[in-house]
């Protein structure tokens, strides 16, 4: 961030520099505070709620599970009930619960490597293990990532066919978050899976957000999951649970997963709050996801129209028509200035248009993620355009302050 942008957002003189870490921490606190006090928002995730609000989620638990049963111990009881529920939804023989997705996928791919005899995992350069897990595949589980492509889309059949070395597993992140929550077409997906089979590799889906992929594919969850040998799903992203994940697949694989789960420290004494919140999410949020996806497309179009009407040089929605209820928004401005404008706009209007951080993919560029949930369903296209106009007005003021500080 430039010195002027740092000082402009605080009203300080250019010589009074604020450390980046401190500035970002302060901005995050303000953004979360603005989210909690906002009267209107496109989506409010669990991580932005208070402890009291999060605990209230369990008030619905009696609707999905018998609360007079004994609490779970080391993976039985309500945890097993959740595993059975997930296996049924995905059309697999069994499923294993894990406290984190990072652990879940390492264990799954480690078990597949033991069966195939090949620790190489073919994946996208933007896949979650490559971007957000501190090289856990190689550092912890002795797996060897092999990057298929770095293009902002899923790997193609030709790219998988053309890999110049054997691999034991092909991991496909559906949707691919860091490319804009993108999905392939159904035909492209089936072709890639077929090529992996030709190369005698197993197919594993990183389906952290697979729940909201049914609209794009126009297929039910079990038909999508049927393409893969194993599928990982998350309970706290789309479903708004407290945390946790599961891997579904053949029963013999799942039995082995549970043995390795124990070795990795993932067989926790009691997990009933997390398991119950996941069951509530499957009951409450899962049926709503198609509506969120369809409305995200309305929001995306209105964002483009709003920025064009406000005189912004360009604004890009990635992908142009969202594949899920989440997508990226790109703007041609300094990311730190945009981030400050977004928080100030929310603080001043109590309308939270942008609930997530802004990143700088390059000089003079800003990108954020848009997440449309239940709260966003009440927004019309005109509501979105009006909020954009207000935001751009605040952004222009921030740019002026930036220019004054740099002068």
What is each PLM-predicted segment?
Residues 2, 11-25, 310-406:
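Conserved C-terminal alpha-helix-loop-beta "cap" of PLP-dependent enzymes
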Residues 160, 214-222, 339:
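Distinct, well-ordered alpha-helical segments
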Residues 178, 183, 226-333, 403-407:
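Active-site C-terminal subdomain of aminotransferase-like
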Residues 153-208, 212:
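Active-site phosphate-binding strand-loop segment of PLP-dependent enzymes
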Residues 144-145, 203-204, 353:
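Hydrophobic beta-strand scaffold residues
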Residues 113-169:
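PLP-dependent aminotransferase-like
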Residues 24, 30-100, 114, 125-131, ...:
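Conserved N-terminal alpha-helix of the aminotransferase class I/II PLP-enzyme fold
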């Amino acid at each position: 961030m430039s010195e002027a942008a740092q000082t402009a957002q605080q009203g300080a003189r250019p010589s009074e520099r604020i450390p980046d870490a401190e500035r970002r921490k302060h901005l995050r606190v303000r953004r979360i505070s603005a989210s909690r006090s906002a009267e209107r928002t496109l989506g409010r995730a669990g991580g932005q709620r208070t402890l009291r609000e999060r605990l209230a989620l369990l008030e619905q638990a009696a609707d999905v599970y018998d609360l007079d049963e004994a609490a779970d111990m080391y993976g039985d009881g309500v945890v097993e009930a959740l595993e059975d529920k997930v296996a049924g939804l995905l059309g697999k023989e069994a499923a294993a619960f894990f406290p984190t997705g990072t652990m879940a996928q390492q264990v799954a791919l480690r078990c597949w490597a033991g069966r195939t005899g090949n620790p190489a995992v073919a994946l996208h350069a933007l896949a979650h293990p490559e971007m957000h897990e501190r090289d856990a595949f190689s550092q912890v589980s002795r797996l060897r990532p092999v990057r298929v492509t770095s293009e902002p889309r899923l790997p193609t059949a030709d790219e998988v066919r053309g890999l110049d070395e054997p691999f034991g597993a092909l991991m496909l992140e559906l949707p691919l978050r860091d490319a804009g929550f993108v999905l392939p077409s159904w035909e492209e997906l089936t072709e890639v899976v077929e090529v992996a089979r030709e190369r005698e590799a197993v197919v594993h889906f990183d389906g952290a957000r697979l729940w909201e992929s049914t609209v794009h594919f126009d297929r039910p969850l079990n038909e999508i999951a049927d393409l893969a040998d194993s599928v990982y799903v998350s309970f706290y992203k789309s479903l708004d649970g407290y945390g946790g994940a599961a891997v579904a697949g053949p029963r013999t694989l799942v039995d082995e997963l549970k043995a390795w789960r124990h070795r990795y420290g993932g067989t926790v004494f009691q997990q009933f709050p997390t398991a119950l919140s996941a069951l509530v999410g499957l009951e409450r949020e899962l049926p709503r996801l198609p509506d969120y996806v369809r409305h995200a497309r309305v929001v995306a179009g209105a964002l483009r129209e709003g920025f064009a009407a406000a005189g912004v040089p360009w604004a890009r929605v990635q992908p142009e028509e969202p594949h899920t209820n989440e997508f990226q928004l790109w703007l041609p401005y300094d990311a730190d200035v945009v981030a400050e404008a977004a928080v100030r706009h929310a603080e001043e209007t109590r309308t939270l248009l942008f609930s997530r951080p802004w990143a700088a993919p390059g000089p003079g560029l800003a990108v954020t993620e848009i997440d449309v949930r239940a709260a966003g369903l009440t927004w019309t296209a005109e509501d979105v355009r009006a909020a954009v106009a207000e935001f751009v007005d605040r952004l222009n003021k921030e740019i002026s302050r930036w220019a004054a500080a740099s002068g």
